[in-house]
């Protein structure tokens, strides 16, 4: 069973976020059900929606939300979810986070695992 707690816009009801978090926690702890939330509902009508959505998603994940209705192409929201996975112990040893955000090391460049930019290849051969 999956329950959608129907998140209300925070701009219309200031307690919408905290009410959603309380309900998500109760659904998970008391009933053991999975929850799904529409990420953009909370930010409806407000500027900088992706920042609000990302923060909501991270906080909802921390309270027990198991899935979200969202656009995975919104980088700020995906980063917030990945950060929540790190903070909640879902991404063990930060493996996904490091794969996504760690830059190339001198060893990977030297070994050819990272391709040099085209301009640099022409100059060096």
Language model features with spans:
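Catalytic alpha/beta core domains of metabolic enzymes, predominantly
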Residues: 1-110
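Terminal or standalone catalytic/regulatory effector modules within metabolic enzymes
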Residues: 111-125
């Amino acid at each position: 069973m999956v329950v959608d707690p129907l998140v209300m816009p925070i701009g219309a009801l200031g307690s919408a976020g905290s009410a959603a978090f309380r309900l998500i926690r109760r659904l998970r702890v008391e009933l053991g059900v999975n929850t799904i939330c529409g990420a953009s509902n909370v930010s409806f009508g407000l500027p900088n929606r992706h920042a609000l959505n990302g923060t909501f998603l991270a906080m909802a994940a921390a309270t027990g939300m198991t899935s979200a209705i969202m656009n995975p192409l919104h980088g700020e929201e995906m980063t917030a979810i990945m950060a929540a996975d790190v903070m909640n112990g879902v991404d063990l040893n930060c493996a996904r986070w490091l794969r996504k955000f760690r830059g190339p090391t001198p060893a990977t460049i030297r070994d050819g695992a990272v391709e040099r930019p085209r301009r640099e290849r022409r100059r060096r051969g």
